[in-house]
Amino acid sequence: MGENDLDYGYEPFADTPEYRAVNETIVQRWVNAMREAGSVHLDRIVDLATGVGTMVQLLIEKLPRAAKPKDVVCVDMSDRALEQAGANLAGSVDRVTPIHSPVQDLALEPESVDMAMWGNGVHYLTGEEQRRTFERIREALRPGGWFLFNSAFVAESRPAETLAFYRGQIATAVRSLRERGVKREKSTPAAESAMFLPLSHYRQMLEQTGFRVEEVREVVAQLYQSAWEKISGFSQYAAGALHGYPLDDAAEALVAAVKPALEQYGFVDEHGERYVPRHWYFAIARKELGALRSGE
């Protein structure tokens, strides 16, 4: 990847085969959980931090025909992304309702949606912002409604045997930045996504905000060089890994450091290709019905 190929957005990573495969697996499990519970009728759903609609598209593809939602509420801070999401979903649902808003400020009518999904974004908020968002989601869900989210930025996402890769990549990137005379602003705080909160935090947050936790599970993805270069070029990833450095310089240095770090610390698959595994975790929770509480 050359300098002119850098794209600081998330979509280049979301377009990789690895990303689609791991998220297809997660979405299929979400659909299966709803089917197993006898609850797959989704009239209206909300997709938080929708981007261009990749996750909700996967969901619609996996749902039985009779269960496909009529109205999808897409929430994002980017007007461009919302416009593209609407175009991508055209023909799949009767109506797409775009909302330009931070997810933590979302205000939907009480008990107006059957399901809320949040793909690969919960880790960008502070703990208090997460709490506020969970509370607003619960308020918007109808009784028995579903809350589904995932993340590859929890404490358990990077097993001990993979840490050498991250350290090697960052060391190489920092060395390159110093050689180029790029200064770090030490007073810049680390991004929330660099905090890597544990799974127990999210489980407790769900319970404290009134959800019934149905399932928390992991899916392991083997990420190869191109995928690592694309996520390393994502602005928020670069800001978390090399906080304090100018964003464009940090992203460029991280991308360039992928190949040497993989060569030194990567795992080798059956075809001789190098990769590093990343653990995605997903949660399935419900807004409880009174009958569910009394029957526990």
Predicted regions and their residues:
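A short glycine-rich, Lys/Arg-flanked "PGG" loop and its adjoining helix->strand segment in the class I
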Residues: 131-143
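A short acidic, Gly/Pro-enriched loop at the edge of an enzyme's catalytic core
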Residues: 108-116
